[in-house]
């Protein structure tokens, strides 16, 4: 009696294993063939008042922002985002915005854009899960309107960026093509807990590990990478985590991530302030507008 039961159990396990393999392969194929990819529409609601052909910038800083973050944008305009020349190289900063359902906020941003001429906007609703759309909008703008930029940095509104030190390191690096750096994430796994801010379902991304990518709080790349990422973006399955999506594009392009310096320079988790320390970092997260102004004044003095 024991032998037939064992044989039946063995057959059941084989069938179960075959079914698991089938559904696993099916989900992978579905992921590869799914139609939900980034679509290029080319329609901008707002474009900045700048001509990169006339004055090619060394570094373009693209800052993701929202309508409610006026204080953050104003603080950045007064500090690291102010148009300037560092070591003879021109730097320019632009803010990436979607749309809002608030008529009052829309009007305020219209006026802000006319006043400062530094806002890039398309017709998608602002929100955390549209950051991929927002980032790709900035990359598309560089591809179409500012391919002359030597380097591009994508960062967020709650960041301190040491543009002087970043420029110094980029000049020392002397890399002008296929260069990508930031806070490297080389062994990250999808979060499957539904209540997490970074939750990604199996249907969105069936694999158990992400490709190498850089923290979305701040990464830097050579100008040619913008066009390469933009051109390949429609062939890469869309994922709402913008830094992972860019990592998927880089994997498709076979562009490897590099360290900017032998010492840590990107701090997505924040860092205690000191003048000496902040003179030798590139990026620090969780900086409020008033704090940014205070830090900048301390560094200038």
UniProtKB/Swiss-Prot annotation:
Its main location: Golgi. Residues 29-301 are lumenal. GO terms for biological process: lipid metabolic process; protein O-linked glycosylation. It holds the Pfam family Galactosyl_T. It is found in: Golgi apparatus membrane. Glycans are attached at residues 130, 174, 231. It comes from the Eukaryota. Pathway: Protein modification; protein glycosylation. The keyword Oxidoreductase does not apply. The chain crosses the membrane at residues 8-28. It is a single-pass type II membrane protein. Residues 1-7 are cytoplasmic. Keywords: Glycoprotein, Glycosyltransferase, Golgi apparatus, Lipid metabolism, Membrane, Signal-anchor, Transferase, Transmembrane, Transmembrane helix. Its EC number is 2.4.1.-. Belongs to the glycosyltransferase 31 family. Catalyzes the transfer of Gal to GlcNAc-based acceptors with a preference for the core3 O-linked glycan GlcNAc(beta1,3)GalNAc structure. Can use glycolipid LC3Cer as an efficient acceptor. This is Beta-1,3-galactosyltransferase 5. It comes from Pan paniscus. The lineage of its organism: Eukaryota, Metazoa, Chordata, Craniata, Vertebrata. The gene is B3GALT5.
